[in-house]
Regions:
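Bacterial N-terminal signal peptides
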Residues: 1-5
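Conserved beta-strand termini and adjacent loop/short-helix elements that scaffold enzyme active sites
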Residues: 33, 194-196, 286, 315-316
């Protein structure tokens, strides 16, 4: 795996340049999952967890891309998104050529590339793909899809960190090890994340950015830009169920929002979800153990909303421990996220009618 400037890549690949087929990022044979913007031949996105699938013939695939800051990625070659990616790497340049696969055998292959860090770490743009063989039509979306709306827990803040007192590092943030990805893998579902660290329903962490909370950010096409707004017609998927895991930051730093404000904003978020996907789409509202009042706040919002197919649950104090299950800054590590997923998976099964199979959560 290598990341090179376009000039250096051109020099290294000069002998093979005539053999490459260049395919624009916007080609319909390439499948993107998550909120993205197509601008001409480019495709841009900044939300955690957005991923693309490319099927191709031949031994080689590279991507021409750029990033506004320093985004990290997970890569899989010829396999599904397992907990352990084949490789992880950073894109920290405006014009970069990343070799995704080389030296493969003859025949069809597939790569999956997932953005593992959140929007504050950078906005990623795919320009084109270089291959020696033909780009093939993507295999198609999975029959199941889950949308997760959340904060740093959903982003994967600190999931790869070794200790709860470790500081945040972008390279240890990995959305693929969160309860969301674990749940999607268990059900064999595609998934997308609408998540941002520090976000609350009515109050963000330490009251940062007052008046601008997840019910507002949820409407955006990009995590870090208030415009343009996202429309359901922009996505090629409709979730079978939506999960909200928010409220921890509302009760952060020893403070809490007024219940009426929390309830109003929560209902607004629920109404946005129902407007996007229809009244029959089930929504699961999860509360952490951050504060004993959080569950009551969520239950009140769901009840007062009067909306159909909305359920609520809480992750109890004993779902995970404060030692071995914690990563950076007291956020759950992979072990902790497995335990959170194990709490919610039965609810998802009941809401959707999906069977619970006898297999591990991973």
């Amino acid at each position: 795996m290598a990341g090179l400037s376009l000039a250096a890549a051109a020099e290294v690949s000069a002998k093979k340049a005539k053999e490459y087929i260049e395919t624009p990022a916007s080609d319909s044979r390439i499948e993107y999952t998550g909120r993205t913007l197509t601008n001409g031949s480019d495709v841009s996105y900044d939300w955690s967890g957005v991923y693309f699938r490319v099927r191709f013939n031949g031994p080689y695939l590279a991507v021409k891309c750029s990033d506004s800051k320093n985004s990290w990625f997970n890569l899989w070659v010829d396999k599904e998104m397992t907990p352990q990616a084949d490789r992880k790497f950073i894109v920290a340049a405006k014009d970069t050529l990343i070799v995704l696969a080389e030296g493969l055998g003859k025949g069809e292959h597939e790569v999956i590339l997932q953005k593992r860090t959140e929007g504050e770490q950078g906005c990623f743009t795919v320009h084109s793909f270089l291959s020696e063989g033909e780009i093939l039509q993507a295999a198609g979306r999975k029959e199941r899809h889950i949308e997760f709306i959340g904060d740093s827990y959903t982003c994967g803040y600190g999931t790869e960190s070794g200790h709860r007192d470790d500081p945040f590092l972008a390279e240890t943030e990995n959305c693929n090890l969160t309860y969301a990805a674990i749940t999607a893998r268990y059900f064999g579902a595609d998934f997308n994340l609408v998540s941002h660290s520090g976000q609350g329903i009515a109050r963000n962490y330490d009251n940062a950015g007052p008046g601008y909370n997840m019910p507002h950010r949820y409407k955006q096409l990009f995590n870090t830009a208030k415009e343009p707004l996202w429309e359901p017609s922009m996505g090629a998927y409709t979730p079978d169920v939506v999960v909200i895991y928010l409220g921890t930051n509302d009760f952060s730093t020893g403070q809490q929002p007024a219940e009426a404000s929390f309830r109003s904003n929560y209902i607004s978020l629920l109404q946005s979800i129902k407007a996007n996907y229809g009244e029959e789409t089930p929504v699961l509202c999860m509360g952490s153990n951050a504060n004993p009042y959080l569950y009551d706040y969520i239950r009140s919002a769901v009840t007062v909303s009067g909306l159909k197919n909305v359920a609520y649950m809480t992750v109890s104090d004993f779902a995970h421990d404060d030692e071995g299950d914690m990563g950076a800054s007291w956020h759950p590590n992979y072990k902790g996220h497995i335990k959170v997923a194990s709490c919610m998976i039965p609810y998802i099964a009941t809401l959707t009618g999906w069977e619970m199979e006898e297999k591990p959560y991973k």
